[in-house]
C-alpha cells in the first residue's frame, strides 16, 4: 500500500510539473504574439502616417496649382496675369 501511495504521489507530482512547464511556455508564446502584434500595429501606423503625408503633399501641390491658374488657366501664373492685365492688380516693374 505504501509503494502504491508513493507511486501515485510521484505521478501527480510529475504531472503538475509538466503542467506548469506547459503553462509557462504558453505564456511566453502569448507574450511573443502580443509583441509581434504591437510591432505590426506600429508599422501600420507608420505606413498610414507616410500615406497621409504623401496625400497632404499632393493636395498642397494641387492647391498651389489651382491658385496659380484660378483666373485665366491659359495665362499661367498670377505674376504673368499682372503683367498682361495691369488693371487686375498692381503693375509689376518687369
Swiss-Prot record:
GO terms for biological process: defense response to Gram-positive bacterium. GO terms for cellular component: extracellular region. Residues 27-46 are annotated as: Disordered. It comes from Litoria fallax (Eastern dwarf tree frog). It comes from the Eukaryota. The modification Leucine amide is found at residue 62. Residues 30-42 have a biased composition (Acidic residues). Expressed by the skin glands. Belongs to the frog skin active peptide (FSAP) family. Brevinin subfamily. This is Preprofallaxidin-9. The lineage of its organism: Eukaryota, Metazoa, Chordata, Craniata, Vertebrata. The keyword Chaperone does not apply. It is found in: Secreted.
Amino acid at each position: 500500500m505504501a509503494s502504491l501511495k508513493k507511486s501515485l504521489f510521484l505521478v501527480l507530482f510529475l504531472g503538475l510539473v509538466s503542467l506548469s512547464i506547459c503553462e509557462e511556455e504558453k505564456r511566453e508564446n502569448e507574450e511573443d504574439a502580443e509583441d509581434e502584434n504591437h510591432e505590426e500595429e506600429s508599422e501600420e501606423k507608420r505606413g498610414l502616417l507616410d500615406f497621409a503625408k504623401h496625400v497632404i503633399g499632393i493636395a498642397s501641390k494641387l492647391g498651389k496649382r489651382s491658385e496659380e491658374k484660378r483666373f485665366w488657366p491659359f495665362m499661367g501664373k498670377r505674376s504673368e496675369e499682372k503683367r498682361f492685365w495691369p488693371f487686375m492688380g498692381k503693375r509689376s516693374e518687369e
